Design a protein with these regions (language model features):
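Membrane-proximal helix-turn-helix segments that form the acceptor-binding/catalytic region
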Residues: 77-87, 103, 107-111, 123-127, ...
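Nucleotide-activated donor-binding/catalytic signature segment of Leloir-type glycosyltransferases, i.e.
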Residues: 251, 258-286
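N-terminal subdomain of nucleotide-sugar transferases
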Residues: 1-52, 163, 169, 193, ...
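Conserved acidic donor-binding segment of nucleotide-sugar-dependent glycosyltransferases
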Residues: 336-337, 341-348, 357-362
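Donor nucleotide-sugar binding/catalytic pocket of nucleotide-sugar-dependent glycosyltransferases
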Residues: 34, 52-54, 125, 144-203, ...
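Short hydrophobic beta-strand element within catalytic cores of glycosyltransferases
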Residues: 293-296, 314-324
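A short, well-ordered alpha-helix in the C-terminal region of glycosyltransferases
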Residues: 350, 363-378
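Conserved donor-binding/catalytic core segment of Leloir-type glycosyltransferases
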Residues: 4, 209-227, 232-236
């Protein structure tokens, strides 16, 4: 089978896109169409994957390159590149990631008689709503990030596509509530590959400083307001009074990083909160390995109530106990697997309680074992890879019939 996979950002790199492509190339020929904001070669063949990038212009043209690659269904550069790739490769199936280019994929798929599978890694309308909640109204947001328009696009897309991949049970339930036939929705969760829980050779660490009585918590991901990092910082201030060795290590970057750094300065927590910035994924994983507890403090918004962060399973796969907010998917998994503690979203006092409950090493080790076992038995990419391959076979077969 020949598959055209559409991804609206640069590649490399995205952990889910990489896992999906690595799995698909084991049995199929895969052509990935992606953005080219980093001005890479238009075509590249790597790890058995055909990578087709959008055209780009020189840096002297400023932000024109961003306009060329803007992921809108009517962008002629996307339409042409996707159309050309599908025609030349003679693709049998289109797999499109998230909503921005779903209509493009569906339109081309209908014209060429090719089935379209939609990978809904995000609740896109709710994610944009979270962005508005912090940034407020602006003309730009109204024109290109309008939740009402995006919800309309979503409702049409989920009805027209041949099959949908959902990342968690709560997302599947939401899609069914929108009128999607349950038979057209399959779970492919953001689980780690088996390599994640195999102990690799250590490289001497990546800069996490700790003392003999330290308790190190790690947050891995984008630095945005709805991810609850402010709550985590305020909780560290409370815990520090009883446990001076507590430390929060933050790995990542994002639009609200400056706000969080300012808060750390205002609370005089420079010795208790460490920002490592964006790290290569292998180095970020090593930071988790050097830490004691994994943290997922996301606000329980509609977005985080219907999606699941990769980092939860990364923490669990390496035997780290987790502290999560009461966003529905993370709360459900942590309670079912008994691999950590749940706190009330946006409640720094309750998060401080959860941190202190993991002060004992024996408690952390027991919860860490439960999380690791859950990944080994259920929440791993071997399981989800089988589901992914099955779905694409079904989609291709249904259109032929």
């Amino acid at each position: 089978m020949i598959i055209c996979h559409i991804w609206d950002a640069d590649y490399p790199w995205d952990v889910r896109v990489e896992k999906i492509c690595d799995s698909l190339v084991k049995k199929h020929e895969v052509h990935l169409v992606c953005r080219n904001s980093k001005r890479r070669p238009r075509y590249e063949y790597a790890k058995s994957l055909h990578i087709h990038r959008l055209p780009c212009v020189s840096e002297r043209f400023g932000s024109l390159n961003n306009l060329i690659g803007f992921p809108a269904f009517f962008n002629p550069f996307w339409v042409y590149t996707i159309w050309r790739t599908i025609k030349r490769a003679k693709a049998d199936v289109i797999l499109v990631r998230d909503l921005p280019l779903a209509w493009t994929a569906l339109g081309i798929g209908r014209l060429l008689g090719i089935p379209v599978v939609l990978d809904m890694a995000e609740n896109y309308p709710a994610m944009i709503k979270d962005l508005w909640a912090r940034q407020g109204f602006s003309i730009l947001n109204f024109l290109v990030r309008n939740p009402s328009v995006i919800r309309f696009i979503e409702r049409a897309s989920v009805r027209w596509c041949d099959h949908i991949l959902a990342v968690v049970e709560e997302s599947r339930d939401r899609l069914i509530s929108l009128g999607v036939n349950p038979a057209r929705v399959s779970l492919v969760i953001n689980t780690p590959t088996s390599a994640r829980w195999v102990e690799p050779p250590r490289d001497g660490g990546v800069g996490v400083s700790r003392g003999p009585q330290s308790l190190i918590l790690v947050y891995l991901g984008l630095l945005e307001w709805a991810r609850g990092i402010e709550t985590a910082i305020r909780a560290i201030q409370r815990v520090h009074e009883r446990l001076p060795g507590v430390k929060l290590v933050i790995v990542g970057s994002g639009r609200h990083e400056g706000d969080f750094r300012l808060l750390v300065d205002q609370l005089r927590l420079q010795d208790s909160v460490q920002f490592l910035g964006w790290l290569d994924y292998s180095k970020a994983i090593e930071v988790i390995r050097e830490s004691d507890v994994g943290l997922v403090p996301h606000h329980a918004t509609e977005s985080w109530n219907t999606t699941i962060p990769n980092k939860l399973f990364d923490y669990m796969s390496m035997g780290k106990p987790v502290i999560v907010s009461n966003a529905k998917p993370t709360e459900r998994i942590v309670r079912e697997e008994r691999c950590g503690i749940v706190f009330e979203e946006k409640n720094a006092e309750d998060l401080a309680r959860a941190i202190l409950a993991l002060e004992r090493k024996a408690t952390r080790e027991e919860m860490g074992r439960c999380g690791r076992d859950a990944v080994a038995k259920r929440y791993n990419w071997t399981v989800d890879e089988e589901q992914l391959l099955r779905v694409l076979d079904i989609a291709a077969g249904s259109r032929k019939q």
